[in-house]
Amino acid sequence: VPELEVDQPRIYFGESADSDDYVVVNSLQDEVDYPLSTEGQSVAYTNYSGDGGVGIGSFFKRLGFALRYSELNLLISNQLGDGSKLIMERNIISRVKKAAPFLYSDNDPYLALVDGNLFWIIDLYTLSDRYPYAQPADTTRINDRSGLPGNFNYIRNSVKAVVNAYDG
């Protein structure tokens, strides 16, 4: 069995991030990557090199995001530089719903490893409760967290959304 090689294991976009959550990358302080020992006293550091995020190097961008998130530190921090970026909308399901609000998403995305990079795959469905000559679906066994409405007679897994776990 060949080994799976992950070239980029870092995940900035995922299913557990709050939809209003943001993270500042490329600040003047290195990001903690992983512990080098089992005691956790020494750690490896990294810096974000992806394409995601909005540059917040200028005063007016920092002011705008400080007002948007009610976070004074975005405005007054001396840890932000010209290359600093703000990554927002990190929850992949809410990100996909904003891109395609007319589709219903599966609330259980899964990771795939493609060419050394991690990608989230989200199933998207088209639904109707007016499909001719079709009986209503039995929805009694559908999980409440599924994101599907309770009444439909047609469902099709018509779209797969793919989100890069590092870049978004």
Predicted regions and their residues:
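Soluble extracytoplasmic regions of secretory-pathway and membrane proteins
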Residues: V1-D167
